[in-house]
Amino acid sequence: MSVFQAKRRGFLALLTFAWLSLAGLAHAAPLRVEKLEVVTATGTTAFQVEVADTEASREQGLMFRKRLAPDKGMLFDFKVPQQAAFWMKNTLIPLDIIFIAPNGRIVSIARNAVPMSEVPIPSGGVVRGVLEIAGGRAAQLGLYPGDRVKHRIFKGG
């Protein structure tokens, strides 16, 4: 085997390893799914939410999803209360983005956020978490700022 062939074979092996490594990252482990409830003036509704509690999972969010069932969602846990802003880059479906204070009270709701938009959507206050649900669902439920979200990450939740 010539030096050229050996280098070429080594390069191809390295390229294959890199490709397989990146392919593995695209299929990261599924997020933990937990129950969450929203409490409005008209009642309580339960959701099964994926919990995004790492930087990587929060960055990925619901990007590239083609659908979201009415009883599903994603809860972004920031662990530390903070101002937050979201965008819809690479998000294919409209979402209701619900910003939630540390005590579980809803601070603000961005209704039917526009898919693929890179315009920042600010929280309008300090939040511990953000809930994303199917666009239009918050209106169906009669969900408003001041209503409550019950989940283990919120005080009293």
Listing of model-derived features with the role each one plays in the protein:
Residues 8-12:
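N-terminal export leaders
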Residues 13-15, 64:
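A periodicity- and composition-biased signal for non-globular, repetitive helical segments
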Residues 15-16, 26:
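Cleavable N-terminal signal peptides
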Residues 22-30:
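Bacterial Sec-dependent signal peptides at the C-terminal "C-region" and cleavage site
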